[in-house]
């Protein structure tokens, strides 16, 4: 299954607030479609599937990509669910978004793909790059790149920058000081249900 490129608000209405996907307010609380207002108790599978979909759409991943992250998280020591969230949060595209350099993760992905973002002074155009503590993130020293990010910084997608990151607006740079804590993950979900979903496949 490829990455979703359809209407973002439609997905938010179905799954709830997805800060990484869209900054548009959800006008209707019920799901889209002809039967959106009908209520019924979802099955356990449906609940696990919904939590998985929240993760996939918020971070803009294909099914194959998310499954690879789940497998990687299982190989590391600690809570698999929390490690999964850390792996996703420490992606370069998400880190650019959390610094406020882009209003959404898709916008951050474009910045990275088009070579506007540097790690320790070197252009990195790989969205899945895992940011590490001690690394600096900056905007390419070109007028077009700087103007783009300056405009984004004026209207960030989220109000607060996580405690593991710091931003220097004057020189359009940020620094990774650690790994994100669970409390700073902006997405509302139960990550254990995501792990259960893949364990039962």
Swiss-Prot record:
Matches recorded under Pfam families: Ribosomal_S4 (PF00163), S4 (PF01479)
UniProt record, GO biological process: ribosomal small subunit biogenesis; translation
Gene Ontology cellular component terms for the protein in this record: chloroplast; small ribosomal subunit
Compositionally biased residues, Basic and acidic residues: 35-45
Similarity field: Belongs to the universal ribosomal protein uS4 family.
PANTHER family: 30S 40S RIBOSOMAL PROTEIN (PTHR11831), SMALL RIBOSOMAL SUBUNIT PROTEIN US4M (PTHR11831:SF4)
Assembly with partners or alone: Part of the 30S ribosomal subunit. Contacts protein S5. The interaction surface between S4 and S5 is involved in control of translational fidelity.
Protein name: Small ribosomal subunit protein uS4c
Gene transcribed to yield this protein: rps4
